[in-house]
Every structure is written in structure tokens, then in C-alpha cells.
Amino acid sequence: MLKAGVIAVQGDVAEHADAIRRAADRHGEDCTVESIRSAGVVPECDLLLLPGGESTTISRLLAEEGIDEEIEAFAAAGKPLLATCAGLIVASRDAKDDRVSTLDILDVSVDRNAFGRQKDSFEAAIDVEGLDEPFPAVFIRAPLIDEVDAAVETLAAVDDRPVAVRQDNVVGTSFHPELTDDSRIHGLAFFS
């Protein structure tokens, strides 16, 4: 049985856990999901999710709890990791904001909240590499991926701007895939 971990210092933890379970079921995998709030659990996981929230707070809490180094080691070990919205910011090489301590596990730079404020939130059906049908992406104070290293594959774009990327075992999205009933992004990141 696979063990999934959802970093639970902020964000849509329950929604991501549900999406992971649905994706695992769709792919014929048995999977348990554990919420992670302290060090020591990440190394036990087979797959890991770093959700959204507020990136400066997330990066601070990860460091305070000692989870940051465990996430870096997890990614370096080649295990599948999905980072969404603020999780993408924290996973990036450069958040262009000194208040965010990035993990540098995804070789991209991001511009926090580039898609606007809360009132500028939107939904869009986007084409995603590896999915047969468009995905209903929800953008809430979403970051813009503005620099992508050659080792990073762009999986989806909005107005020619990357919003989903993959580098080896790490997938990052600007949007919130957990806020829909569609678990295909979780399936793409973890079970494809």
C-alpha cells in the first residue's frame, strides 16, 4: 500500500487528500493519506503534496518544524511530489521575494500573485500535456512561472505563460487542482 503525505501547515489539506484517494482509486492503487505537521513523517511517504496557502508563512513553518530539509531529500530521492500555487512558490528556485525561503527542487522562478488579487481569481479550461481533455483549473492569487530551466517541461500554459510544469519527479501548478472534482492532475503527478 502506498503512503501519501500532504504537508498540513496551511492550505486545502482535506481537499488534496480526497483528490489523491480518487486518483489512486482510478489508477487501481491502494493509498493511505497522512497530514504532515512536523518532521519525521516525510521520509516514510511514497508520494508528497505541498499545497497552497501563503508562501512566506509556509516556508517559515517548514523551516521551524524541520520539514524543509525532508522535502528536499524526498525530491532528491526521485519520489513523486506535487506542489500547487503557494506550494509551487516554495518549491521553486527563486520566488523573487526575500521573505520566502525556497526549497530549490523545481528549477523555475515565479512571480507571487502575478495573476492578481483575490478578486481577480478565475477558472479556465486548460490543455495539459498527458491529459486527453481540458482540465478545469482554478486560479486564486496565482503565481506566474516566469523563467523555466531547460530541464523543466511545460505541461500547460495560459496566454503563453506556463501554469503547470514538470521536472523529473516534481510537478508544480500555479492553480488549485484540488478545488474541482477532477483528480487527473494528482493522477498525472503521482500515478502516471
Curated annotation (Swiss-Prot):
One of its GO terms (biological process) is glutamine catabolic process. Pathway: Cofactor biosynthesis; pyridoxal 5'-phosphate biosynthesis. L-glutamine binds at residues 53-55, 112, 140-141. Keywords: Glutamine amidotransferase, Hydrolase, Lyase, Pyridoxal phosphate. The keyword ATP-binding does not apply. InterPro entries: Class_I_gatase-like, PdxT/SNO. It catalyses: aldehydo-D-ribose 5-phosphate + D-glyceraldehyde 3-phosphate + L-glutamine = pyridoxal 5'-phosphate + L-glutamate + phosphate + 3 H2O + H(+); L-glutamine + H2O = L-glutamate + NH4(+). The active site is at 85 (nucleophile), 176 (charge relay system), 178 (charge relay system). It comes from the Archaea. One of its GO terms (molecular function) is pyridoxal 5'-phosphate synthase (glutamine hydrolysing) activity. Its EC number is 4.3.3.6, 3.5.1.2. In the presence of PdxS, forms a dodecamer of heterodimers. Only shows activity in the heterodimer. Belongs to the glutaminase PdxT/SNO family. This is Pyridoxal 5'-phosphate synthase subunit PdxT. It comes from Natronomonas pharaonis (strain ATCC 35678 / DSM 2160 / CIP 103997 / JCM 8858 / NBRC 14720 / NCIMB 2260 / Gabara) (Halobacterium pharaonis). The gene is pdxT.
